[in-house]
UniProtKB/Swiss-Prot annotation:
Residue numbers binding Mg(2+): T26
Pfam families documented for this protein: GTP_EFTU (PF00009), GTP_EFTU_D2 (PF03144), GTP_EFTU_D3 (PF03143)
Segments of this protein annotated with the region G3: 81-84
Keyword check for GTP-binding: yes
Name used for this protein in its record: Elongation factor Tu
Region (G1): 19-26
Catalytic activities: GTP + H2O = GDP + phosphate + H(+)
Residue positions binding GTP: 19-26, 81-85, 136-139
Keyword Cytoplasm set for record: yes
Region (G5): 174-176
Gene3D superfamilies documented for this protein: P-loop containing nucleotide triphosphate hydrolases, Translation factors
Residue ranges of the region described as G4: 136-139
Amino acid sequence: MAKEKFARNKPHVNIGTIGHVDHGKTTLTAAITAVLAVTNGAKMMDYDAIDNAPEERERGITIATSHVEYETNNRHYAHVDCPGHADYVKNMITGAAQMDGAILVVSAADGPMPQTREHILLSKQVGVPYIVVFMNKEDMVDDEELLELVEMEIRELLDMYDFPGDDTPIVAGSAKEALDEAKTGTLGPWSAKIQKLMAAVDEYIPEPTREVDRDFLMPVEDVFSISGRGTVVTGRIERGTVKIGDAIEIVGIRDTQKTTVTGIEMFRKEMDQGLAGDNCGVLVRGIGKDDVERGQVLCKPGTINPHTKFTAEIYVLSKEEGGRHTPFFTNYRPQFYVRTTDVTGAIYLPEGTEMVMPGDNVSITVELIHPIAMEKGTKFAIREGGRTVGAGVVAEILA
């Protein structure tokens, strides 16, 4: 049997379910696939298949995530669901599964809970741009006023973390009832609420800008000198495109340098342009082999700057995950592995936080000893003696 080709006839969007434990994230994921299996030929995934998520490794951290795919009339979705709270935290901080938007599941019977708040905060910190809310377990609430109260609480919570509370779509329903309905092959009133939710997701979460359409950025992995041709910088293009003749900048570690691309090669073949995802060599004019080093980036001029001080959201590996066995305190100085290199930096803890235990996630301020090209959303690993002890994402640039 020939391998099925991925048909690109619909825009592709990555989403995920977030929210407090036992509010019904996985049941909702199963219900969406079940309802869309009846209408759009999605492959139905039952609860157990989603809940027994395979483990993946990302930046040296093991994360259990379930990937489900389905289609609405307008789009193709890849949907990620994590079984445990720690998996969510790790997933969002490492960016193991990028999310263009999220479905926040809140139990109508319980209202927002601590992890509801934490997942909204994390979404803000790691740059999940849009949230749509599903108020689950509506079948367990008889009081209309209680539903309105929970909805109001959710909107206030979103506002608190700079999401547009008033404009966020909130759809009430019951994932369990919808799942039971869809399993019979006939859709009823509960399934209609799942369809309403997906219509809101279709409409409210915009199509993401493709990596190719963004500003050019390539982390430097290696530098060679080719006699008669000059200096070649190799790496994998993270985003954007680069063409022969383009003016580019070399940013990070040292003073920013300007240069022009005189050639692009991939697999020893000449190319006119390199695209996001390509591993290639870029020939640069007037730059010596010793003027560039691993850890810098090539980029479109003026699009990314070198920084040393920032705030970040980090997850610290537990002892079982191969992390530290002891807590660390303010002024801890590990290495920060950003894109292709390690840079030493000092960690400052927020006021009122005495220490950070293995397994915690925390907001910190970092000061690096060298400037590195970075922006909000840049991911990094925290290492000590060559082993990963944490992972983080830049929340805000300070200097």
